[in-house]
Amino acid sequence: MEANKIIITGGATRIGAAIAKKLSGPNKEILIHYNKSKSKAESLKKELEINGTKVYLVKADLSKETDVNKMVKFAKSKLKYFDCLVNNASLFENDKLDNFTTDSWGKHLRTNLRTPALLSKEFAKNI
């Protein structure tokens, strides 16, 4: 099975951008999530649209459930359904024992664990 409607979290840079490039092509629709990399997301969008890919960009802080819900709603409005979810986004800060806080730990857990689970649950509803 080949995916045609794809969501990639953390898709604007590094591995996410490489995945978007690999999965792009005519008759493909890709929703690229970004948080702080707006200019890179816009540049990638232009690049992918040259080869016939329809690209949607969505900004969201994946540590915030309200942003995750808005992203899912946006994805459904644009893609109608999706047949591939790439949970690529992650939060990686250089926390050490001397600057570690429960707030930063919570943000890591929400971004790196809870959100992929919530998005996977939404994906399961679409297949």
Describe every region a protein language model picked out.
Residues S120-K121:
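A short, exposed helix-loop element centered on a Lys and neighboring polar residues
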Residues K38, K59-M71, T102:
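The beta1-alpha1 cofactor-binding region of Rossmann-like NAD(H)/NADP(H)-dependent oxidoreductases
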Residues K96-L97, S104-L109:
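Substrate-binding pocket helix/loop in short-chain dehydrogenase/reductase
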Residues K28-E42:
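Conserved glycine-rich Rossmann-like NAD(P)H-binding loop of the short-chain dehydrogenase/reductase
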